[in-house]
Structure formats: structure tokens, C-alpha cells
Amino acid sequence: MSKTHFGFQSVDEQDKAQKVAGVFHSVAANYDLMNDLMSGGLHRAWKMFTIAQANVRPGYKVLDIAGGTGDLSKAFAKQAGETGEVWHTDINESMLRVGRDRLLDKGVITPALLCDAEKIPFPDNYFDVVTVAFGLRNMTHKDIALAEMRRVLKPAGRLLVLEFSKVWDPLKKVYDVYSFKVLPWLGEHFAKDAGSYQYLAESIRMHPDQETLKTMMEQAGLDGVKYYNLSAGVVALHVGTKY
């Protein structure tokens, strides 16, 4: 049976999805609060930059993969307007439910769908923009997921991947202390769940760095791939186009 990683652990591929699901079932209720605490609110700026780069126009069809609590979908729905189509999706039912309810509370009505990024249930050449924010690192077969995202893009459509990445070397020691000491402490004290935030830190370290992910996107068939380092490389936004 094939092995993969769950944080720093080596696990069977079929077990990873269940373990990741357990993490997000656990954190869903406190997800927005913990994002604010862990990033000092910076996650909002990272997402705003992604929204600006997506450049969604009226009438666009947009797929928000691993959409979580709906920050991107909310913005895209307003930009695409009544003539557009924005799908808020997540593989985790708890996260999708929290996101759907949050969007409805904000007066945003957009379809919500349980969706495995490795088996996207849409036809070829359907979307103008596909986004995945802080979700790719949790996927078992990132290459398959990236190829699927490209498949559902229209020609000239763009994929945007916002994800934790490799921090600049001068900050590495401080970042390690924050990741492996402070994050689990925050998880324990504010969400009663140190383990899920230990996994968060480990999953970030196991995720491909900026150049590796750029190569993976190119190998998936995307062109003109570039990336933007945000907050000294704590996060990177990769953008690629389907031609």
C-alpha cells in the first residue's frame, strides 16, 4: 500500500484523507478566530491580494476549492454578479457548512458543494478562474489535483494557489519557534485542540517550496506560472494560466 505524509508522520494514502478530515472537523467552529490569532490578521491581507490578482469580472465562472469559511467566495460572488457563477466548495462537510452559513449571514447566496479536488465534478473548460487557498498542502495527490484544476479551466483561464511556503532564511529560527511552540499553545488555549495546530505546523514544513510548486504547476500543464512572496515567504501566491 502506498505511503504519504500526514504532517511528519508516514501514513497509508487511504488513511491521510480521514486524518485530515478529523483535523478540519475539529477546527471548523473556531477557524476564523484562530486564523486571526495565528496570523495577527494578516490572512485577510493575503486573501485580499489573491482576490485582486484573480481580477474576477461580471459574468465570470469561478471555482473556489477548499473554500472553507468563504472569504474568497464572498468577494468573488459580488464581483461576478448576477450574470456570473461562483461555486464555494470544500471536501470537509463541517468547513463547508460553516462557510455556507457565514455566507448566508452576509447575504451572499452562492452554491456550496462537497468537492474532492482530485475528482472535480465539472466538465472541461468550464471556469474562468479557479482558486485554492490554504488547501493544496492537505491534498494527498497534489499533482492530480493541479491537473484537475487545469482541466476545468477555460482556455486563458487562471489558477491561483495561495499557500504557506518557505520563509526567508534569516527568519527561519524564529518562525520555527513560533510554529512549533506558539501555534500549538494557541490551539490548546483558544480551541482546546493543540494536536490540530501541531499538524498545521508540520504540514507547512512538508509542503513544496515556491520553486518546487511552480514546477509542479508547469508539469500540470499551466503556462506563465509566477509567484509572489507575501510576508517574507510565510505565504506565497502562485498564478498560472491555461493556454
From Swiss-Prot:
Pathway: Quinol/quinone metabolism; menaquinone biosynthesis; menaquinol from 1,4-dihydroxy-2-naphthoate: step 2/2; Cofactor biosynthesis; ubiquinone biosynthesis. Its EC number is 2.1.1.163, 2.1.1.201. Keywords: Menaquinone biosynthesis, Methyltransferase, S-adenosyl-L-methionine, Transferase, Ubiquinone biosynthesis. S-adenosyl-L-methionine binds at T69, D90, D116, A117. The keyword Transmembrane helix does not apply. It is an enzyme of class 2 (transferase). The keyword Transit peptide does not apply. InterPro entries: SAM-dependent_MTases_sf, UbiE/COQ5_MeTrFase, UbiE/COQ5_MeTrFase_CS. GO terms for molecular function: 2-methoxy-6-polyprenyl-1,4-benzoquinol methyltransferase activity; demethylmenaquinone methyltransferase activity. GO terms for biological process: aerobic respiration; menaquinone biosynthetic process; methylation. It catalyses: a 2-demethylmenaquinol + S-adenosyl-L-methionine = a menaquinol + S-adenosyl-L-homocysteine + H(+); a 2-methoxy-6-(all-trans-polyprenyl)benzene-1,4-diol + S-adenosyl-L-methionine = a 5-methoxy-2-methyl-3-(all-trans-polyprenyl)benzene-1,4-diol + S-adenosyl-L-homocysteine + H(+). PROSITE patterns: SAM_MT_UBIE (PS51608), UBIE_1 (PS01183). It holds the Pfam family Ubie_methyltran. Coiled coil: none annotated. Methyltransferase required for the conversion of demethylmenaquinol (DMKH2) to menaquinol (MKH2) and the conversion of 2-polyprenyl-6-methoxy-1,4-benzoquinol (DDMQH2) to 2-polyprenyl-3-methyl-6-methoxy-1,4-benzoquinol (DMQH2). Belongs to the class I-like SAM-binding methyltransferase superfamily. MenG/UbiE family. NCBIfam families: MenG_MenH_UbiE, PRK00216.1-1. This is Ubiquinone/menaquinone biosynthesis C-methyltransferase UbiE. It comes from Paraburkholderia xenovorans (strain LB400).
